[in-house]
Swiss-Prot record:
It is found in: Cell membrane. The chain crosses the membrane at residues 6-26, 30-50, 65-85, 168-188, 225-245, 256-276, 283-303, 312-332, 334-354. It holds the Pfam family AI-2E_transport. This is Putative transport protein YtvI. Keywords: Cell membrane, Membrane, Transmembrane, Transmembrane helix, Transport. The keyword Signal does not apply. GO terms for biological process: transmembrane transport.
Length: 371
């Protein structure tokens, strides 16, 4: 066999093995390294600010890093305080307005029982009495089976809910530890950013350093674009919801629009977690015009999200809209709602490798081409 083909085969095998090994190592080490990955992301965000303060203030870098971290912590605490205040205000509003609605709902259930369920029960009882003995026994057996199954499922659901309570409290110390380690790692990474960068330049080959720098720049640009795109999408959702609720004369339209915009960011929940129960409640309590109005508003939010998300994402991260749409669909089919984030992220990484010429470098290595 030709020597070059053997070399190509083994180099291809080496590249595939290294790629698979890197993915496996990243996957299995993630539970141990994710606080430091968070720190790396935070450090990459704040170090330009620290560099600017180094030039302007002339203070030691340690003081500038502490100042920037303190500012970000205070900003996060401020946002959290505002959210808690909004939740408290909303809870007080619900405590004032819910009792009459609950009373209306109970009255509706009583009316439904007396006008529909009880007559239906009487009719079914008459039909049951007209059946033969073996048919009655069969129906009773099926009802008992359904009852046992429902009781079993209800017990399992209750046990899962009760198990989640100690798990939640057990997560609090771990969350606090992760937060502390992430902040400490962010401080040290940012303080020694240039030293660590120089150390990596000395350790890694020039070609790897150049490609890594280019890929990092592309990924940073894409990440910034992704955050901007999400901010734009949330803002559009908030504006549409605010206008719709204002037209429907719903109280606290601004607060509700703000909360729906934030919930719309969550992959598993989305705006539907607010709209769907709201529409059901309005329908049950007989407020059909309001329910139809909220339903139309929900459809408008859904349609605008589906139409604008691929276009805004593609424009922000510099990827073709069709490729973005394919990535969103493939990610959703493979990984569910989390795939809506994972799909574009993988596409961004592939795009970064193509743009920076890293794939070309790998291909040149495999095909034994000299540069």
């Amino acid at each position: 066999m030709n020597q070059s083909y053997i070399t190509i085969f083994f180099r291809t095998l080496f590249v595939i093995s290294m790629t698979a090994g890197s993915i496996a190592a990243a996957y299995y080490s993630f539970p141990l390294t994710y606080p430091f990955l968070i720190a790396l992301i935070l450090s990459s965000v704040i170090h330009p600010v620290v560099d600017y303060l180094d030039k302007v203030t002339g203070f030691p870098r340690t003081i500038n890093v502490l100042g920037v971290l303190a500012f970000f912590l205070l900003a996060a605490f401020g946002v959290l305080t505002i959210l808690v205040a909004e939740i408290v205000t909303g809870t007080a509003y619900l405590a004032k307005t819910l009792p009459p609605h609950i009373s209306t709902f109970i009255s509706y259930c009583e009316k439904l029982f007396t006008t529909h369920i009880q007559p239906l029960y009487n009719e079914l009882t008459l039909l049951f009495q007209e059946l033969e003995t073996n048919q009655q026994a069969s129906i009773v057996t099926h009802i008992q089976t359904l009852g046992d199954s429902a009781a079993k499922n209800a017990g399992l659901l209750l046990s899962h809910i009760l198990e989640m309570i100690p798990r939640f409290f057990a997560l609090l110390p771990n969350t606090a530890a992760v937060l502390i380690f992430s902040l400490l790692a962010t401080f040290f990474m940012t303080k020694d950013w240039h030293k660590l960068k120089a150390m990596l330049v000395l350790i890694l080959p020039d070609r790897v350093t150049a490609n890594s720098k280019a890929i990092s720049s592309e990924l940073k640009k894409a990440m910034t674009g992704f955050i901007k795109a999400q901010a734009v999408l949330v803002f559009i959702t908030m504006v549409i919801v605010f206008i719709g609720l204002s037209l429907l004369k719903v109280e606290h339209a601004a607060t509700i629009a703000f909360l729906i915009g934030l919930v719309d960011l969550l992959p598993y929940l989305g705006a539907g977690s607010v709209f769907v129960p709201w529409i059901l409640y309005l329908s049950i309590t007989g407020q059909l015009p309001q329910a139809i109005g909220i339903g139309i508003l929900y459809l408008v939010v859904l349609i605008q999200r589906q139409l604008t998300e691929p276009k805004i994402l593609s424009k922000s991260i510099g990827i073709d809209p069709l490729a973005t749409l394919i990535a969103l669909f493939a990610g959703f089919k493979l990984f569910g709602f989390l795939g809506l984030i994972a799909g574009p992220a993988v596409l961004v990484i592939i795009q970064a490798f193509i743009t920076t010429g890293a794939l070309k470098e790998i291909w040149s290595y495999i095909t034994v081409q000299q540069k």
